[in-house]
Structures are given as structure tokens and as C-alpha cells.
Amino acid sequence: MEFLSEKFALKSPPSKNSDFYMGTGGALEHVMETLDNESFYGKATAGKCVQAFGPLPRAEHHVRLDRTSPCQDSSVNYGITKVEGQPLHTELNRAMDGCNNLRMSPVKGMPEKSELDELGDKCDSNVSSSKKRRHRTTFTSLQLEELEKVFQKTHYPDVYVREQLALRTELTEARVQVWFQNRRAKWRKRERYGQIQQAKSHFAATYDISVLPRTDSYPQIQNNLWAGNTSGGSVVTSCMLPRDASSCMTPYSHSPRTDSSYTGFSNHQNQFGHVPLNNFFTDSLLTGTTNGHAFETKPEFERRSSSIAVLRMKAKEHTANISWAM
């Protein structure tokens, strides 16, 4: 009697006529069977529940809760009493079986690589087609004439001028603005090119290098000057210094040279740079050699030989000045 009072909180103490009364030496199984068969509802309430849900079948065993994954064991109902033959439990079992099949079967329905490439190409084509394409405008001669007239007046027309010009040329104001931008860029390019050409012409006029000997004339000079193999050298008797020089240098005699002399001449030429030689030339007279060989008296030959002699004298004078300064 004390056992039942401690384990079950009853509203009233059990009586001998009740099913829950267990006398001395009574069995506990009888009490548990009585609890299983009892509906725990009153008569009125039990009738309503039977009409709404139907008779509840007897549970044969208690629910076994498993802690494993629901995809591995289909008997887990998460606290819902498993009753055999009930539609709700049947649907749950089918769902669990489908989960097991999905877990064990390979993944299907995924697109292949070729399909993904095709989808990417379609997306790229859609993006490129959605971009605004630029159309090149072809201007007529009348339109270009009107545009050039305005450009001669001003390179930066305002909005009002552009609108009036667009009405006359039957173009949009945006097209007219773009044309003026391109025309200004073209004009600036031509201006830069003209400045470069002007600088080149000014340099050529300032530094006249037409009188300097050319490299292709060296063999001719060698053949004409040093054809005769003589022991004596020619003597330069005239003064070939600038006109404002106060005195003349002593005559400079030179002997026949080999090709190395012309190499030194080219070095001296590079040292002095492009210097006008018109002022260095005066009336020069070249005498013949001891064996009777005379130089040619052609003007071109005299000019070339005089320039060579002047450059050699300038090189010698420059060397003397450097040695005197040291």
C-alpha cells in the first residue's frame, strides 16, 4: 500500500473495490496490465476521441530510440509511438527507405562538363549581345563642309552651336561633339609634326654640312693625291685661316700617307663637329712635287684638298693649345 502511494500520485486513496488495489502478497504484473488496458479518460471524453480519431490499437512494445543516423536505421520515429499498421508510420518508413537509397546510390542528374561549357557560352553570348554596339558614322561632303566651317571659327563650340550645327547637318548633337573631339586630336597631331619639321629645317640651315667631304670620296682623293710614290711632300703656300686672323701660320708640309692618315682625319672631323668651312677658304695654291708631278686643278679637287689641309692644321693647332695650357 505504501509502495503504490509513493510511485503513483492518486487523487484519492485506493479502495478495495478499485483495480489498483493490491493486497498483501499481490503481484505487480496485474497492476501493470490494468494500467495498459485503462483509457484514462472519462466516458464522455472517450467517446469524442473515438469518434474523431478512431480506436487506438494496443502498443505491443515500447519505442526503441536509436542514436544512429536516420539514414542508416529506419526504425527511428523521434518520440512518436510506433504502432503497426498506422498510415503515418508507413509514410515515415517509406521516407526513411528513400533516404537510404539516396545515400547508397551515386549522384545522378548532375550536368556534364560539355553541358556546363554550352551553358557558359550561352551566358557569354547573352552578355555580349546586351552590350551597346558602336556604329561608325559616315559623313557626307556637305556635312563635312559645314563642320569644317565651324571648326575654322572655333575649336570648342558650345552646346547651342552644336545643336544648330546638328540641325543643319541632320546629325545628333552627340555625333557632332564626337566629331569635334576627333578633329581637335587630328589638329594637335599635325601641329606637333609641323613643329618637328620646322626644327629640322632650322637646324639644317644653321649647320651647313654640304661642304664637308663624304666617305665615298676618300678612294678618289687617295688615288689623285698619293698616286705618285715620292719622297718629298707638297707645301701649302697660302694662308688658309679665317679671314679675321691677324697672322698666318708657317707653311705646312705633308708627306704621302697611307690609309691610316684618313682614319685620323675622320677622327678629327668627328672631334670638331659640323663647322661651316666657307670662311676658312681663301685663294690657295698647291705646288707640285719634286719629281714634276702636279696636282689637278679642278675646283672640286681643290676644295676637297683644302678642306683636308685646313682640318689637319686645326688639329695641330688644337694639340698645341692643349699642350701649352698644360
UniProtKB/Swiss-Prot annotation:
Residue ranges, annotated region (Transactivation domain): 192-326
Keyword Repressor applies: yes
Chief place where the protein resides: nucleus
Residues where N6-acetyllysine is found: 131
UniProt-listed Gene3D superfamilies: Homeodomain-like
Transmembrane domains' residue ranges: none
Protein location: Nucleus
Post-translational modification: Acetylated at Lys-131 by EP300; increases interaction with EP300 and stimulates ALX1 transcriptional activity.
Phosphoserine: modified positions: 12, 69, 306
UniProt keyword annotations, A-Z: Acetylation, Activator, Developmental protein, DNA-binding, Homeobox, Nucleus, Phosphoprotein, Repressor, Transcription, Transcription regulation
Binding region for DNA: 132-191
One GO cellular component term: transcription regulator complex
GO terms for biological process, alphabetical: anterior/posterior pattern specification; embryonic limb morphogenesis; embryonic skeletal system morphogenesis; mesenchymal cell development; negative regulation of DNA-templated transcription; negative regulation of transcription by RNA polymerase II; neural tube closure; positive regulation of DNA-templated transcription
Tissue specificity remark: Expressed in chondrocytes.
Keyword Acetylation: yes
UniProt GO MF annotations: DNA-binding transcription activator activity, RNA polymerase II-specific; DNA-binding transcription factor activity; protein homodimerization activity; RNA polymerase II transcription regulatory region sequence-specific DNA binding; sequence-specific DNA binding; sequence-specific double-stranded DNA binding
Residues spanned by motif OAR: 306-319
Domain text: The OAR motif may negatively regulate DNA-binding and therefore transcriptional activity. It is found in the C-terminal transactivation domain that stimulates transcription.
Its job: Sequence-specific DNA-binding transcription factor that binds palindromic sequences within promoters and may activate or repress the transcription of a subset of genes. Most probably regulates the expression of genes involved in the development of mesenchyme-derived craniofacial structures. Early on in development, it plays a role in forebrain mesenchyme survival. May also induce epithelial to mesenchymal transition (EMT) through the expression of SNAI1.
Similarity-based family: Belongs to the paired homeobox family.
Oligomeric form and interacting partners: Binds DNA as a homodimer; required for transcriptional activation. Interacts (via homeobox domain) with EP300; acetylates ALX1 and stimulates its transcriptional activity.
Name of the protein in question: ALX homeobox protein 1
Organism: Rattus norvegicus
Upper lineage: Eukaryota, Metazoa, Chordata, Craniata, Vertebrata
Gene: Alx1
